Regions:
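The alpha/beta-hydrolase serine catalytic core
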Residues: 18, 120-161
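Catalytic nucleophile-loop/oxyanion-hole region of alpha/beta-hydrolase
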Residues: 40, 67-94
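Gly/Ala-rich beta-loop-alpha elbow adjacent to hydrolase catalytic centers
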Residues: 102-110
Length: 161
């Protein structure tokens, strides 16, 4: 039985130390997957490391500014910059194909990045990505719409009534 190695990688972005967790033998990897999780706290929702035990793929999980051991304050634009910085570092240092796995909000970050820099990743996987960012970031709270529907359901009224 092969044990998946786990080490930490740290980089500085805008003076803040960003901590990434490396899973697998990154020095001998034939591919690297950069795992971009969603909001801070959602990084443990997807467990991929055990699936890498017998592969030549290394997984690097980024912890954005303000998440876990990473310094700084969390922000959406900061998270995008963190991903781009880590991606460029991995491409230059290891010179193997770099893929992205964007989960939830991380999927929105990765989508934003590849829209402007389509060649930064060889392949991209979006797992349950946030796709309606206009509704998410609009001035009108999403909760108003949800409460409207909830009241109709709770009062057993159809929307036409």
């Amino acid at each position: 039985m092969r044990i998946v190695m786990k080490t930490e990688l740290s980089l500085y972005v805008d003076g803040n130390k960003i901590i990434c967790e490396q899973h697998g033998d990154i020095k001998n990897a034939k591919k690297i997957v950069l795992f971009c999780h969603g909001f801070p706290g959602s990084s443990r929702l997807v467990r991929l490391c055990d699936n890498l035990k017998n592969s030549s793929i290394s997984l690097v999980e980024i912890n954005y500014r303000g998440d876990k051991k990473s310094e700084g304050k969390f922000s959406f634009l900061g998270s995008i910059k963190d991903i781009k910085t880590v991606a460029n570092y991995l491409k230059v240092k290891y010179k193997v194909p770099l893929h992205a796995l964007g989960y939830s909000m991380g999927g929105l970050y990765v989508s934003n990045i590849i829209n402007k820099e389509p060649h930064i990743f060889k392949k991209v996987i979006l797992l349950n990505p946030v796709v309606d960012s206009m509704a998410l970031f609009s001035n009108k709270p999403l909760m108003d719409e949800l409460w409207k529907h909830a009241k109709n359901i709770l009062s057993l009224k159809t929307p036409e009534m």
